[in-house]
């Protein structure tokens, strides 16, 4: 099947943790991996294009979401699949066309830079060295954090194994009651420490992306005087470079996260085994506890050895991409397959635009047509306000009536007093 690599991509998505929603990046990754696995030749890609397979891969992203009552995911899936298959077909057909456009663009840029070939090569070389200087502190920090966090993880987990061995010796008659809380705590501690490890390590990828933007912008300014009227085409090439370099940063983050999840999957069964062995005999449990500390140390050390070189390998990849740019812009450039990065960038931009438009429309629809329970709630509030207004009006009317009655009583009293005065006046005379 063409999609073995895509299946691995979906598995990686599952390993790194399900998100609240299917993201544009996940969809774009599935589509690009599918296209890459078909063929690097556009004609062959069109001939072997099987929409049903791409549809299956996209639907797989929604399986967990549709298990819930999730109207948003269902609507997104209905609109996304036709859009994605159409975009994919157009992608395959436009590949050769884009390749020719990029070739012509490079030829024009090279022609403009040719009289200054030595200066351009020197500027790119200086930029490479500046990039290395920018990244080196962060690479060192990443390596230090890997060592620090793994050592902290080891220190956090090892005492649980030692404590459980001690409890086993002291409470042989009540193993389940005594050891189960410690086994549960070990499981919780594994989850907590792996999450903290990811939170400490993955932000470095974002720092790298900031430095990449700075480096590419400085390179653009340094080459601008030599580009003359080909500046726009040079900028386009630099955009492709920045896209590829930042893609490496995203892949670095994904690899760190995936390695941390793999560590969790290796450590979690150790705690589960302890809980399972509580129902067995004391001798088997004692053997498992004796081996627990060694298993913890080995898995943590394997993680450290695997992740420690990630930063250095990332730096090497960026330097290599800068050198490839120098080769593409040089006078002796060969047939460089540079169009694929632009093709992927275009795909991701279109998928992001689709998601943004869909979410904006969804938000507008929700504003114009509220869900039925919310409509009922608003109607109830309006009715309550009307009732309160009516009650207030009734109270005001009652107050007015009382005031009128009081005024009438006062007037009657005044009239009676005047009549009494008039009746007494003749007697006094």
Swiss-Prot record:
Q: Which GO terms describe its molecular function?
A: cholesterol transfer activity; phosphatidylcholine-sterol O-acyltransferase activator activity; phospholipid binding
One GO term of the biological process aspect: phospholipid efflux
**Primary localization class, coarse:** secreted
Task: Describe PTMs of this protein.
Answer: Phosphorylation sites are present in the extracellular medium.
Which residue windows does the record flag with biased composition (Low complexity)? 381-420
Q: Where is this region: 13 X 22 AA approximate tandem repeats?
A: 33-330
Any one GO CC term of the record: low-density lipoprotein particle
Q: Where in the cell is the protein located?
A: Secreted
Domain of life of the organism encoding this protein: Eukaryota
Tissue expression summary: Secreted in plasma.
Region spans: Disordered? 359-429
Query: Do you know which Pfam families this protein is assigned to?
Result: Apolipoprotein
Key words, A-Z: Chylomicron, HDL, Lipid transport, Phosphoprotein, Repeat, Secreted, Signal, Transport
Q: Which InterPro entries match?
A: ApoA_E (IPR000074), Apolipoprotein_A1/A4/E (IPR050163)
Return the sequence repeat spans: 33-54, 60-81, 82-103, 115-136, 137-158, 159-180, 181-202, 203-224, 225-246, 247-268, 269-286, 287-308, 309-330
Q: Which residues form the signal peptide?
A: 1-20
Query: Know anything about its domains from the record?
Result: Nine of the thirteen 22-amino acid tandem repeats (each 22-mer is actually a tandem array of two, A and B, related 11-mers) occurring in this sequence are predicted to be highly alpha-helical, and many of these helices are amphipathic. They may therefore serve as lipid-binding domains with lecithin:cholesterol acyltransferase (LCAT) activating abilities.
What task does this protein carry out? May have a role in chylomicrons and VLDL secretion and catabolism. Required for efficient activation of lipoprotein lipase by ApoC-II; potent activator of LCAT. Apoa-IV is a major component of HDL and chylomicrons.
Family the UniProt entry places it in? Belongs to the apolipoprotein A1/A4/E family.
Q: Quote the subunit structure annotation.
A: Homodimer.
Name the UniProt record assigns to this protein: Apolipoprotein A-IV
This chain is encoded by the gene named: APOA4
């Amino acid at each position: 099947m063409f999609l073995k690599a895509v299946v691995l991509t979906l598995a990686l998505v599952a390993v790194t943790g399900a998100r609240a929603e299917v993201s544009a990046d996940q969809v774009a990754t599935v589509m690009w991996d599918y296209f890459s696995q078909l063929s690097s030749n556009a004609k062959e890609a069109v001939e072997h294009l099987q929409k049903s397979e791409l549809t299956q891969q996209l639907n797989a992203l929604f399986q967990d979401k549709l298990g819930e009552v999730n109207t948003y995911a269902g609507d997104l899936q209905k609109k996304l699949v036709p859009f994605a298959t159409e975009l994919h077909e157009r992608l395959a057909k436009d590949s050769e066309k884009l390749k020719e456009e990029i070739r012509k663009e490079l030829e024009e840029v090279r022609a403009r830079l040719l009289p200054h070939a030595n200066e351009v090569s020197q500027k790119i070389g200086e930029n490479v060295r500046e990039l290395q200087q920018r990244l080196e502190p962060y690479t060192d920090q990443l390596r230090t954090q890997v060592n620090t966090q793994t050592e902290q993880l080891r220190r956090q987990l090892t005492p649980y194994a030692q404590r459980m061995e001690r409890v086993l010796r002291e409470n042989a008659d009540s193993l389940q009651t005594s050891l189960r809380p410690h086994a549960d705590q070990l499981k919780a501690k594994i989850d907590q420490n792996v999450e903290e490890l990811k939170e400490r390590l993955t932000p470095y990828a974002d720092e790298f992306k900031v430095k990449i933007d700075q480096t590419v912008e400085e390179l653009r300014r340094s080459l601008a005087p030599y580009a003359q009227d080909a500046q726009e085409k040079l900028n386009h090439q630099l955009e492709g470079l920045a896209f590829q370099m930042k893609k490496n940063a995203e892949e670095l983050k994904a690899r760190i996260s995936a390695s941390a999840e793999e560590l969790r999957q290796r450590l979690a069964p150790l705690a589960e085994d302890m809980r399972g062995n509580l129902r067995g005999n004391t001798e088997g449990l004692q053997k498992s506890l004796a081996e627990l500390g060694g298993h913890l140390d080995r898995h943590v050390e394997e993680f450290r050895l695997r992740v420690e070189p990630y930063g250095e390998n990332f730096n090497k990849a960026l330097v290599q991409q800068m050198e490839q740019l120098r080769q593409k812009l040089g006078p002796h450039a060969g047939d460089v397959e540079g169009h694929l990065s632009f093709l992927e960038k275009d795909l991701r931009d279109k998928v992001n635009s689709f998601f943004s438009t869909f979410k904006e429309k969804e938000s507008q629809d929700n504003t114009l047509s509220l869900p039925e329970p919310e409509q009922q709630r608003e109607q109830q509030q309006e009715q309550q306000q009307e009732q309160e207004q009516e009650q207030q009006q009734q109270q005001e009317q009652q107050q007015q009536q009382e005031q009128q009655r009081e005024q009438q009583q006062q007037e009657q009293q005044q009239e009676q007093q005047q009549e009494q005065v008039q009746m007494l006046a003749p007697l006094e005379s």
